[in-house]
Amino acid sequence: MQKSLVSLAWVFAAILGAICLGVLALHKGESINTLWLVVASACIYSIGYRFYSHFIAYRVLKLDDNRATPACVRNDGRDFVPTDKAITFGHHFAAIAGAGPLVGPILAAQMGYLPSILWILIGSVLGGCVHDFVVLFASIRRDGKSLGEMIKLEMGQFVGMIASLGILGIMLIIIAILAMVVVKALAHSPWGFFTIAMTIPIAILMGLYMRFFRPHKILEVSVIGFILLIIAIYAGKYVSLDPKLASIFTFDASSLAWMIMGYGFVASILPVWFLLAPRDYLSTFLKIGVIGVLVVAIVFVAPPLQIPKITPFVDGSGPVFAGSVFPFLFITVACGTISGFHALISSGTTPKMLAKESDARLVGYGSMVMESVVALMALVCAGILHPGLYFAINSPEVSIGKDIADAASVISSWGFSISAEEISEMTKNIGESSILSRTGGAPTFAIGLAMIVYHILGDPSVMAFWYHFAILFEALFILTAVDAGTRTARFMIQDLLGNVYKPLGNLSSYKAGIFATLLCVVGWGYFLYQGTIDPKGGIYTLWPLFGVSNQMLAGMALLLVTVVLFKMGRFKGAMISALPAVLILSITFYSGILKVVPKSNDSVLNNVSHVAQMQIIKEKIALTTDEKALKTLQKSFFNHAIDAILCVFFMLVALLVLIVSVRICSNAYFKNQIYPPLAETPYIKVV
């Protein structure tokens, strides 16, 4: 009887989710209640985790808790440490949940709410969550090896070396971009800097408490950490109000860049239980807490989505970013649905912490479900704003101008009527001097969150506090991806160096670890620092590559798992990774090609293509006599040239992995030839 009731409940959830999604898709009014989205997502994510992740875990991957994980076999107290699955979940979620799920969906909102909702919900359940889960599985069956090293083992030395170089390049770009977002959020913000700084001693206290004083007492240390975190947040507010204290905790962007480099270096070489894992777990409290409160607040307030279902900008003519809905919406949403960066964490720090194989389901699939929820909440924060206000915040200065009246006039001409007074009122309510062209997604999320709180409390004076709290939240949200990313990149560099000089590949060696970490931090730190002193240089040169390279990385990771499953003889099961791989690689190859096509009569394609931009800039250089303008054009030409070259390189790497994957899978299926042989570590039974 009880089993039948449970089955009926799941059937009801499926029907309810389908109805809510149908309402979102077919609604024709000017606005729609966000509750439809909340209910639809709750049903779809619950069904996906309960049934699809279970099917993958026990029918395809066949997880075995009697098989010892790398953390148990190689327990060294530093990198390989068996860790409670709640802590591991906290670490993994904190590490993967960077800027992407907050920024991508907000930018994609320029095309309307429906395309992003469908891609986030369906794409994450069938693609992104699967991607994180299966890569984590592959790594724990290969002694916690990195993605590049696994490609080398399963596809051959040459392919592995080329792929590792490409993956490392993508990784350094991603870390530098994430670090720059943190720098921009904390620059000249004593409240934000103080709170972020305090999470370090709090995390160390938690690590020592669990390691030496009260091992396995997760609830105790959770309560202690949460209370101290709340105290730090409130103390940060008073620090910012005291002129003397505020001056101590106020830093410019360049100083913060050096500090983040130092923090990334130290966090990467210290034992994982001492700082990285407890700090990520602590950050997860705030991340999940804020998102959870935001979901409850949305249910309570039930604000309408004011952004249209589909806007005229699906053709690629929008001011926020260039490119049509296919393929550039998928590239822009990025981490909210699927992210190659996650594959690096799933084959970096996390597989070295899992205490048993079944934990991979919650940690891999479950963490990505949570990140996808974050992406939807970010989309809601953008969608509940007046469309005119959304475009005022996210459109570049070159499109709307510097003056509020001019901006209001331009945006109204796009069909989203807004007055200068409405823009000024919002600017005043959040305590900023201007909200025009505050691109990047973070201010939009912060304003949306502040508006939801305002609707609950009914007092516009609270908006300034919650706006700045949200900016702080985003900085904490992203910094955890920087430290975990640096540690993961250190593993990748050691894998590469080990091919040249074997002792450098020894993960247990402190000297080798310090050397590899130094190379890693110098790699991403250079681009970060240059970006703080040159608004068109450093990481800003490589920023346009983030979306394409990140998704290309996800495609390569899915190909690896497909090869592994084919070698294991699980041909039908391999479709869980093969089908998403085909879709993601189709999207990324198409978008990559569009980024390097020559100049044409299509203005949208010209805005997207680096090669077309080089041709346009070259024509301008020939007509320019002003020395300052000439230097600016030459710098822009150089940036586009670098982006075009790297885009082609990343596509060639992905194409090489694709060709070899098809060959290996074909031989396994049609000829029963397994070469290179399956590289699983020998079975060791848990003692």
Question: Which residues does each predicted region cover?
Answer:
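Loop-to-transmembrane helix boundary motifs in multi-pass membrane proteins
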Residues: 154-172, 366-373, 439-441, 460-470, ...
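Transmembrane helix-loop junctions in multi-pass membrane proteins
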Residues: 18-31, 102, 114, 172-188, ...
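Membrane-interface "cap" regions at the ends of multi-pass membrane proteins
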Residues: 1-14, 47-102, 284, 324, ...
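Extracellular/periplasmic helix-exit of transmembrane alpha-helices
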Residues: 298-314, 369-447, 484, 529-537
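Membrane-interface helix-loop-helix modules in multi-pass membrane proteins
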Residues: 22-28, 32-33, 80-142, 153-157, ...
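Membrane-interface loop-to-helix entry segments
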Residues: 35-43, 47-60, 166, 190-233, ...
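Extracellular loop-to-transmembrane helix junctions
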Residues: 31-50, 108-138, 148, 193-203, ...
